[in-house]
Amino acid sequence: MKKILFSILAIAALISCGKDDNNSDAPAYSAEEAKTEVKATMDNFYDCLKKANDGGFANFLYNTITKAPGQNQAWFGKLADQFEDQHQGLFTALDDNKRFDFNSFKGTYTWSNVTNSWTKEANTAKIVLIFPATATSTTNNARAEIDNYQDELVMNQDNENVYLPKKAHLFISVDNAKQLEVTLRNVEYKKLGEGFTPTAIDLAIFTNPFTTTIKLAKKEPTIYTLNFNFSSPQGCATGLAGSIKLTSDNLDSFTSFEEAVEFINVVAFQDKFQVIANVDVKSVHKAGKKIADLEGVDFNTYFKAELYKNNRKVADVKVEEDNRGDSDLFFIFSDGSKQRAESYIEDFEEKVENIFKRFFKD
C-alpha cells in the first residue's frame, strides 16, 4: 500500500495546467502512442529541472551555501554570523518577544571586506543589505531588501501572544539582476488544536528563471481550493489545481483524516499532460476503513484517476495485480494492456540527484 501511495504522489508531483475540457470525443491514444507520451512528459520534466539547476537563483544559492577554499563555513553563514554578533540586541528581542519586529531591523547594512563587518545607516522605510554575492567577489554586487512585513496578533490557548505573518515582500539581486523575490500578499488563519492553521494563502515566489504561485482559498464553509503553478519563460509549466470538501467547518472536531474529509478532486499537469483524480474519502470512512490500510484492488473503489494529453485520453490509473500476484499501480491503455506506473519513476531519485549533483557534494 505504501508503494502505491508513493507512486500516486510521485506521479502527481511530476505531472502536476492545462485546464482544457477533457470530456471531448477525441480518440484515445493507442497503447504505443500513450507510452511514448508518458515517457516524453517525464523527459520534459527532467529537462525543466536541468533549467532550474542552470538558472541564476540556483547559481546564487550554490555560491551562498558552499564553503569557499580555505573557509570552514559557507559564505552566507559568515555574513549571517557577523550580522548577528553585531546586532545581538535585535535578536535577543526577537527571541524574547517571539516576533520579527520589522521596524527595529529597518536600516541599510553594508558589508566591508576590509573590516569583515557590517556598517549601518538609518533607513526608516525598509531593511537593505548590500554585500558581495560570493566569497571571492571584490565588490558589493548583491542586494537584499525587505520593504514590507505585516503580522497578526493572536492569543494561543495559554493566553500568550502569538504573531503570525500576514504580508511580506523581499527580493535579492546580484549584479542588478533579480534572483529571488517573495511576495506574500495575504494569509488567513484559524485555530486548530494548540496552534493555528492557514485557511487562505496568496503567495508568489520568483527563483530565477522560475515563478511559483500558491493560492489556498476557502470557497464555502467546508470547501477549500488549492492552486499551485511552477513555470518559466523557457516553456516549463507544472501545476496542480485541487479542491477538498470537509465534513465540518469545526477543524477541532475531527479525530482522523477519514472523518474530516468528504472528497478530494485534483487536476495535476505538466504542460499539456494531465492527471485527473478524485478520492471518495467519505465512503472510506463509511466503510470503517483507513486510506493507508486499503488492500489491493479495493483501492479502486474509492480512488479514480485518468491521464490525458491534448484532450485525448492516455490511460486509466488503477491498482491491479502483477504477474506475481502482488498489487501495484498500473496505467491501463486503450487496448487493455497495462504497465506499472512505477516503471516511469523508479530512477527518479537517481536522476534528480544527478541533475543537482553539485548540491549533494560534501
Locations of regions flagged by a protein language model:
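Positively charged n-region of N-terminal signal peptides that target proteins for export
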Residues: 1-4, 18-19
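C-terminal motif of bacterial Sec signal peptides marking the signal peptidase cleavage site
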Residues: 13-16
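Long, acidic/polar, low-complexity amphipathic helices and coiled-coil-like
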Residues: 82-227
